[in-house]
Each structure stands twice: as C-alpha cells, then as structure tokens.
Amino acid sequence: LIAYKVGSMTSLDWTPHCQSVELVMNGKHVGNYLLIEQIRADSNRVPCEDGFLLECDFHYDNEIQWIQTPGKCIQMQNGIPFGIKYPDYDDGLTGLMLSEIKEYVRTVSEAVYGDNFKDSYEGYAKYLDVKSFIDYWIVFEVMINHELGNPGSVFLHKSADGKLTAGPIWDFDWGVLSYNVSPQARNGLVNRDSFWYARLFDDSDFKAAVKSRWNELLPQLKTIPAFIDEMEKTLQTSAELNFRMWDPSEDASQNGGVIVNGDERMSYNAAVARLKKIYEERLEIISKNL
C-alpha cells in the first residue's frame, strides 16, 4: 500500500491503484486483503499496446524468456532474466516480432555496457527513458526492495515509437522486510549495483540526475508518514480482527525459523510505528548517500 502511494507520486506512466478490503468467502469473513489492479497492456494501464511489456523474473514464469547479458543479477554472475509479458502468442506474437524484441533488448544492453555508454546519441540515453528509470529506482530504494538485484516482478515497457521505459512497480512483498538483515538498508543504497543501474551509476550525469530528482521528490515523500498515520486509524478495527484470524508469528518463519522482518510478533500499532520509523530513516540515509 505504501509502495504504491510512493509510486503514484512519481512520473511513472502508470502505477496500479489499490484498496484495502474486507474479504468474505461463502459468508465467512476471512480478513483484510489488498485489492489491486492487474498489470496489462492497456490504454488505461500500461501504454504499450502497439509495443511490448517485459518482465524480469528469476522464477521464469513467462512463456517466453531468456537470459540477456551483460547485466547484474544476484542469481548469476552475469545476465538478467527477461520474459515477454505482452504480446504473447495469443495476442498475435510472431517469430519475427519475438526476434525483433530480443534484438532490441540486446541492443539496449550493449549500449548500457558499451564503451560509449555516456554518449547522448549512441549510449544508453538513446534507448532508455531515463527519468522513468530514475523514478523507478527511487521507489525501490525508499521501500528497500532488493528485487532489482534479484529480479522478480521487475517490469519494463516500450510503445512503438517510444524509448524503453521502467515500470510499472509491482509486488513489494520484500519491501522493508530486509531492514533487520541488510547492512545496506540501514546504512546506504540497496540497489546501487543492481540490474542496469550497476552501469548507469558509473555515469556522473546519471548520478547528478538521480540526486536532482530525489531532491525534487523529497517534499512529497516526506508526506508519507502522515499517510501511514491516516491508514493506521482507518484500518485499526480491521487489523485487530485480522490479527485474531491470522497470527503473523505463526507463518512468518518461512525462512528457516528466522524472524526476518522484525515485526512478526509485534502488535499492529507497534508494527506500524516501526514501518514509519524505517521509512523516515530511509529518507535520511538516501539523502546522505546520493
């Protein structure tokens, strides 16, 4: 919920709308869930109906997928797992279209890692919508989402006559979760060396653009704690009922018995206070490290 609120403050083409809901199944109340718009190529969602939508995901859940090198991913020494979310064969994808999409991704990757990558006309800026890549990175960085380095639910899209654009954001089940176990989360930047950003940050102009955009967005980002307070009050009764139905401490240890998030055995209000504190600390940490 917080991640999508942050995303909506940026220039990303589209951020899914979401709403906390009470779910009733067969007449039985089963708790509080987040209802969210699905990602799809659509004039009202991801504007790439005449282009393509890519998903980078090491789970390899897409019908069409490949490893593109160079690129930085925790799962392998070199390469990024790409998949085509749209179009698929049911949408009319042909062998020629598939070859063209893969060739385009290869061209972009080589431009990012090429000797002339800083060149405005032949480097990464020729192919990437740089502002979207900056805003996308900022959302991941604020929410401590490591999935840029371990690609899962990382989306890119391109319209027929546009550049390769970052977004939309999605998932964030690992957002804030790693704060207790990641020194980077508590002291620095978690996605400085992830994905293509490992190369982009080698360009002083890109770094300067990130810092400038950060300072531009910071006043809006500082309003999120008030939004957290508002949602805490709105969901108070719902959360109390939800905690009785689903004890977070019982299924929180899917990671070999380790409490990875740090709030599994906290009360609702204590967990919210922790979330707000971490968020405020991240704003300070990022400001110091850019």
Identify the meaning behind each predicted range:
Residues 20-28, 35-41, 159-161, 171-175, ...:
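An acidic- and aromatic-residue-enriched active-site/binding cleft used to recognize and process polar
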Residues 11-16, 28-138:
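Internal "kinase-insert"/substrate-recognition segments embedded within catalytic cores
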Residues 82-150, 154-290:
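Middle-to-C-terminal accessory/interaction subdomains
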Residues 21, 33-34, 51-53, 154, ...:
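A broad, low-specificity signal marking well-ordered, structured residues that form hydrophobic/aromatic
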Residues 17-19, 30, 150, 163:
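Short loop/turn segments at connectors of secondary-structure elements within structured domains
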Residues 1-28:
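A conserved helix-loop-beta module that forms one wall/lid of the active-site cleft
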